[in-house]
């Protein structure tokens, strides 16, 4: 590939509004009983299609609001989270959407905020303040963003008791003058240029084998700072036949089936469990139950059966 081809490819990736799709973490692709159509149902622009047991994202229709990433139970849809995490840190827990007036760190749409991002920011600053524009007429996310954001906050509180305040309009603070506005715009442009390449998602082949998705790493980091957590986990009851179904449908490889001597043993990596319920729905004898793990179990691998 020539230099110009590489430059064009990098530009196209940088301007593509779609989240990255990892089919190996998609419940539809995994053939989980009941499947999954949450991303299809939440997309305000009809940019999501479910075709051939996988998710297809329309580059033209997608606005990059991020709502699909928040509802995906297997973290199969994701944006690079490092830049948003840094913006929350620079803003000391304050962030605005791109349509909110005033100054401060910004993200394209508050729909891109995940439970992990909110919980991790809360573990640093205690309170997170978010400013939104007029979602009802916004062409990026639309009127469902506030409700969806509230659900993300509730999920985030499983990992850290974060307090979140959402305001419409400017972030609390002094109004910005003309000179300060120009400096803020200039600084924003410089940051955008500097962060453009680092913000690109890694190709699937570049991910480290066995590494948790970024969203789960943020949740785990927040949980390590919390007094107590309600991390999702599963329990296997009597009647398990040690078949491989639960391991096959698990989107994050949280469940392992290991041969030990003449028998198989099931293990759960708690930090990798999202509580998606794929194993619960797909278990042939229906002996798997969803529970909550305390803080001390989050970093453990537990024997299930």
Report each predicted region and the residues it spans.
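Ferredoxin-like iron-sulfur electron-transfer modules
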Residues: 8-35, 46-64, 82-85, 171, ...
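Basic (Lys/Arg-enriched) interaction patch that binds polyanionic ligands
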Residues: 55, 60-71, 175-179, 183-184
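A glycine- and small/hydrophobic-rich beta-loop-beta segment
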Residues: 213-219
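Flanking helices and flexible, charged tails adjoining ferredoxin-like Fe-S electron-transfer domains
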Residues: 1-18, 23-24, 28, 67-174, ...
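Catalytic cofactor-binding cores of redox enzymes
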Residues: 164, 176, 180, 219
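N-terminal secretory signal peptides and thylakoid transit peptides that target proteins
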Residues: 170-196
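A structural signal for short beta-strand/turn segments enriched in small hydrophobics and glycine
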Residues: 36-39, 43, 68, 72, ...
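Extended, charge-rich helix/loop segments that form flexible
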Residues: 185, 191, 195-213
């Amino acid at each position: 590939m020539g230099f110009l081809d590489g430059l064009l490819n990098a530009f196209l990736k940088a301007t593509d509004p779609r989240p990255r799709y990892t089919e190996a973490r998609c419940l539809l692709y995994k053939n989980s009983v009941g499947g999954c159509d949450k991303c299809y149902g939440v997309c305000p622009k009809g940019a999501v299609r479910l075709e051939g047991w996988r998710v297809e994202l329309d580059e033209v229709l997608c606005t990059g609001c991020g709502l699909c990433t928040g509802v995906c139970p297997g973290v199969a849809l994701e944006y690079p989270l490092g830049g948003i995490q840094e913006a929350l840190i620079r803003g000391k827990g304050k962030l605005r959407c791109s349509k909110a007036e005033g100054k401060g760190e910004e993200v394209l749409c508050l729909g891109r905020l995940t439970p992990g991002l909110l919980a991790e920011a809360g573990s640093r600053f205690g309170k997170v303040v978010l400013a939104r524009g007029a979602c009802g007429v916004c062409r990026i996310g639309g009127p469902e963003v506030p409700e969806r954001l509230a659900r993300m906050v509730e999920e985030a509180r499983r990992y850290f008791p974060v307090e979140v305040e959402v305001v419409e309009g400017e972030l609390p603070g002094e109004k910005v003058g003309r000179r300060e506005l120009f400096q803020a715009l200039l600084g924003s442009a410089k940051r955008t240029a500097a962060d453009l390449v680092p913000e690109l998602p890694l190709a699937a082949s570049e991910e480290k084998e066995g590494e948790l998705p970024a969203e789960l790493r943020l949740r785990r980091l927040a949980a390590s700072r919390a007094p107590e957590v309600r991390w999702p986990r599963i329990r296997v009851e009597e009647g398990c036949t040690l078949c491989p179904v639960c391991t096959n449908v698990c989107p994050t490889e949280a469940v392992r089936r290991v041969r030990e001597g003449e028998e198989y043993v099931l293990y759960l990596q708690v930090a990798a469990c999202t509580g998606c319920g794929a194993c619960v729905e797909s278990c042939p004898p229906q002996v798997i139950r969803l529970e909550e793990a305390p803080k001390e179990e989050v970093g453990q691998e537990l024997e299930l059966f």
